[in-house]
C-alpha cells in the first residue's frame, strides 16, 4: 500500500490508507506510515490504539502525550497510570478494554528541554478521524467513552460540553452507548485532585454498570 503524503497546506485525510477488510493488526500497520497531516513530521511515531480485540468498552482520548510518543503506546504516561488506578477502583479490568485517541501523533511545542502538549486543530482531527472510525467499526464496542473535551467534541459535535454533560448517555452511531467524562490529565492538573479523582471513578462505575 502506498503512503499518503500531504503537506500541511492542503486538506488531508487518512481515508485512502484504510485497508480493505480491516483488522486491528492491518490498521496498526497501515497507520504507522500515515502522513495525512503535518503532525507525522514532529511526532516520533504513530501511536495507535491498544487493548483487547474483544473489548466491550473503548476509551478515546485526545492524542498521545510525551511518554506515549516515545514508547509508541497509548495511555502509558502519568494520565494513563491514573486511568489504570481509576479503572481498578471502578471494577473495570484494564486488560478487557481498548484505549485509543482521536489523533495518533503527538502535537507539541518546545519549552526549554521539555515538549509541551498542544491541542490539535480541527483539520488535524479530521485528517486522523478515519483511523478511529475504522478501529470502532472493527471492535463494535458496547460502550464508547470520550475522555475530555477534544474527544467528546470530535465525536459528539462541537457544541458538546463535558462540564455540563459528563456521565450522560448520548445517542451516537459509534456504539450502543456513548458517554463522556473528563480526561485523566485534567485531574493531574486540578487543585482538588482527590475530589476530581473520586468523581472520575464514579463516572467509570456508571460505565461498569453498562457492561
Identify the function of each model-found stretch:
Residues 2-211:
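A polyanion-binding, active-site-adjacent surface
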Amino acid at each position: 500500500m502506498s503512503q499518503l503524503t500531504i503537506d500541511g497546506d492542503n486538506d488531508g485525510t487518512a481515508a485512502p490508507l484504510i485497508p480493505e477488510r480491516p483488522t486491528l493488526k492491518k490498521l496498526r500497520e497501515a497507520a504507522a506510515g500515515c502522513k495525512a497531516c503535518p503532525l507525522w513530521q514532529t511526532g516520533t511515531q504513530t501511536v495507535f490504539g491498544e487493548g483487547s480485540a474483544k473489548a466491550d468498552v473503548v476509551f478515546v482520548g485526545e492524542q498521545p502525550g510525551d511518554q506515549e510518543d516515545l514508547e509508541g503506546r497509548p495511555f502509558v504516561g502519568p494520565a494513563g497510570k491514573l486511568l489504570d488506578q481509576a479503572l481498578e477502583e471502578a471494577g473495570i479490568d484494564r486488560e478487557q478494554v481498548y484505549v485509543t485517541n482521536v489523533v495518533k501523533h503527538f502535537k507539541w511545542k518546545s519549552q526549554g528541554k521539555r515538549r509541551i502538549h498542544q491541542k490539535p486543530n480541527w483539520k488535524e482531527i479530521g485528517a486522523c478521524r478515519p483511523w478511529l472510525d475504522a478501529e470502532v467499526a472493527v471492535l463494535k464496542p458496547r460502550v464508547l467513552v470520550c475522555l475530555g473535551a477534544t474527544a467528546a467534541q470530535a465525536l459528539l459535535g462541537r457544541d458538546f460540553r463535558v462540564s455540563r454533560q459528563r456521565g450522560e448517555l448520548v445517542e451516537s452511531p459509534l456504539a450502543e452507548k456513548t458517554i463522556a467524562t473528563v480526561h485523566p490529565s485534567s485531574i493531574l492538573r486540578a487543585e482538588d485532585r482527590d475530589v476530581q479523582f473520586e468523581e472520575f471513578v464514579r463516572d467509570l462505575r456508571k460505565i461498569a454498570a453498562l457492561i
